Curated annotation (Swiss-Prot):
Cofactor field: FAD
Name this protein carries in UniProt: Quinone-dependent D-lactate dehydrogenase
Keyword terms of this UniProt record: Cell inner membrane, Cell membrane, FAD, Flavoprotein, Membrane, Oxidoreductase, Quinone
Signal peptide feature range: none
Predominant location category: membrane
Region (Disordered): 546-571
Record organism: Escherichia coli (strain K12)
Amino acid sequence: MSSMTTTDNKAFLNELARLVGSSHLLTDPAKTARYRKGFRSGQGDALAVVFPGSLLELWRVLKACVTADKIILMQAANTGLTEGSTPNGNDYDRDVVIISTLRLDKLHVLGKGEQVLAYPGTTLYSLEKALKPLGREPHSVIGSSCIGASVIGGICNNSGGSLVQRGPAYTEMSLFARINEDGKLTLVNHLGIDLGETPEQILSKLDDDRIKDDDVRHDGRHAHDYDYVHRVRDIEADTPARYNADPDRLFESSGCAGKLAVFAVRLDTFEAEKNQQVFYIGTNQPEVLTEIRRHILANFENLPVAGEYMHRDIYDIAEKYGKDTFLMIDKLGTDKMPFFFNLKGRTDAMLEKVKFFRPHFTDRAMQKFGHLFPSHLPPRMKNWRDKYEHHLLLKMAGDGVGEAKSWLVDYFKQAEGDFFVCTPEEGSKAFLHRFAAAGAAIRYQAVHSDEVEDILALDIALRRNDTEWYEHLPPEIDSQLVHKLYYGHFMCYVFHQDYIVKKGVDVHALKEQMLELLQQRGAQYPAEHNVGHLYKAPETLQKFYRENDPTNSMNPGIGKTSKRKNWQEVE
């Protein structure tokens, strides 16, 4: 680094400290490590991590970064699974500044709770908690909310979710900053709320909670994926119901993946479903679940609340390696989970510096902790696990409960398999077990890191008319794997496929073989975790990124695109 650059950076960092206070600026690599390292994988260098305390401070920090020609990486909870929330390596052509929005966690309820205004650090959990007394729910419930994921992070990555009727996270109403073609920072207010003219007026009004009912307009723009229920019912369509790069779901902040700095989003909320009932379905024939899905989506008057699939293998892995997660949520509640994940992240970062500790110490310790407790799953679930390879957790509500029960009784008079009507405790534990599955494969890999090469995690969206949903791998690929773990959102045909790879296997080459097979099946990937730095963005998505960020100063390199200024390619 030249002396001029060092001097310039010193002045720049002094300016950031002046804007937010020195206690809200980190430059020591040891202290910035947990913000530079991804939730599952991925890391890189950063000049600084800065924590603005108001939207106006965020605007001023952005302006300082643009003036100093720095790369800007917006980060909220850093719970992304595909490395899109952190720097990627050290081959950028400019310094990287991470702007953490964790302090900007306000939430504004509009009207009687039919809509909300979420800020950059608002978490799904805090939104869920605020809406509960109003009898309403956000787009996403148990899942991302338990690990402190942010609302805006979900919008920016059009995240999915387990709720069949709500589709991917989406809005057409947001407030965002964009760096234009001339390298100038501009603030765009498309919230449909009168907040003033200048950035200072607009942001101060939000910071001070000075929004009146008269300021809010209802002009026909959508604050959720309004036609998803029609798409998911179209079982003859030759395309997936939802996936990250769907061109029809890319709109300004929605799907921007950090190419815009999003200050606020306006979102619809949903009436909480009452009188819910879980049906636990088991079969040894995949085509039975195919028939159930197609019949329900095409013929039921009432769509399911959720329909979650688990294969017996992930059932077993989750029972053993997701036990501590299950017990913590079951005994302590979801509100404690963000704290524990945060604590684990801090502990891991600290222990990495101590040579005495083996890698994944906290995972190994929590695994041993889980063994101290007796079996946690209900007897009827265990019985179904022994009988059946394929499991479907079908949750219905209201009139849908009777509709599903009468049809399932008739259907299983001739179909292979069976179902039982869960008690409230069984239903809760069944879905909690399914949630624990999402982290169980990672835990398995961490505990057995000496014996396995890595985990290859894919999330895929199948065509809605596909009847061959259950994967059969060729022997040359199957022989490279220790475990194949299949689970997902069955009604939406979105599957999480985690492969535990044998020691010594080239994981990158294996992944390319896997993706080739998925392309042959007409699947889209990723389905809901977004491209991050692990997947190549398709051309339509790259075009969207270029339109949002013409100078390539915001989260460059995402989707395996250029990291260089003005989208220059490496020669």
